[in-house]
């Protein structure tokens, strides 16, 4: 005779801690990988010329993030479909703007765009997990609005890409938070196009207010879509209004409920 299957409640009690541990180990691996690279970046920063340091720094950050997504994919706990971003990989002078549902949004976009820079809080420049690598990659600090715009324009003129989340923080109100104008100002000053990117998910995981220790429904699914390409603007306020309306109409939340 075969033994009866364990009741659903018992299976959940057994499975839940394993799933929680697996997810935490993946996040821990991302952090440890970042810490290890930042130790190397700290040594390379004073030795490498600016252009070479920028290229190596960005490529290594993208590589580390791709490793995270590869492991997450094998675990089948987090499923990411971001292949469409590969079409942008080699473009020069491009601003990529996206909605911001999760703490992992920059990780999923930068993993596919090794020439891209992000704008980071000035305080993060001294974070041991992020600071040395970000400085080597010449990520852009937001010490001041004027300095941030000037550095971003210079980076774009040198062939870089810029990843921005115009909501400024993770989404807290449906469909999107009000957009900040920085991306539009930079696009006008640099006269570069703006590529809209949608991140679709039904999962609340690592959204605003979601604690790291809390296990969400699994699997967690993220799908990245390419949206419209906006031409270099003459009027940054008009571009801001147009892009915000476009995202408000195009964001898909709850599309992957199962």
PLM features: residue spans?
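Membrane-anchoring hydrophobic helices of lipid-metabolizing enzymes
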Residues: 2-94
């Amino acid at each position: 005779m075969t033994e009866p299957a364990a009741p659903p409640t018992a299976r959940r009690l057994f499975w839940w801690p394993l799933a929680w541990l697996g997810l935490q180990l993946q996040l821990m691996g991302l952090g440890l990988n970042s810490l290890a690279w930042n130790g190397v970046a700290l040594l390379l920063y004073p030795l490498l010329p600016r252009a070479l340091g920028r290229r190596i720094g960005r490529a290594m950050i993208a590589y580390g993030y791709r490793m995270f997504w590869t492991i997450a994919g094998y675990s089948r706990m987090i499923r990411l479909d971001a292949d469409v971003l590969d079409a942008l990989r080699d473009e020069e002078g491009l601003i990529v703007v996206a909605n911001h549902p999760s703490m992992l949004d920059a990780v999923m976009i930068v993993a596919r765009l090794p020439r891209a820079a992000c704008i980071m809080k000035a305080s993060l420049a001294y974070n041991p997990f992020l600071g040395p690598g970000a400085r080597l990659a010449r990520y852009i600090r937001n010490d001041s609005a004027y300095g941030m715009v000037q550095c971003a324009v210079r980076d774009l003129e040198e062939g870089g890409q810029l990843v921005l989340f115009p909501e400024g923080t993770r989404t807290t109100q449906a469909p999107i938070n009000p957009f900040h104008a920085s991306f539009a100002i930079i696009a006008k000053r640099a006269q570069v196009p703006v590529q809209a990117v949608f991140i679709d998910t039904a999962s609340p995981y690592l959204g605003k207010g979601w604690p790291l220790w809390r296990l969400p429904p699994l699997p967690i699914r993220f799908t990245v879509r390419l949206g419209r390409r906006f031409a270099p603007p003459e009027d940054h306020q008009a571009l801001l209004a147009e892009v915000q309306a476009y995202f408000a109409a195009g964001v898909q939340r709850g599309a992957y409920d199962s």
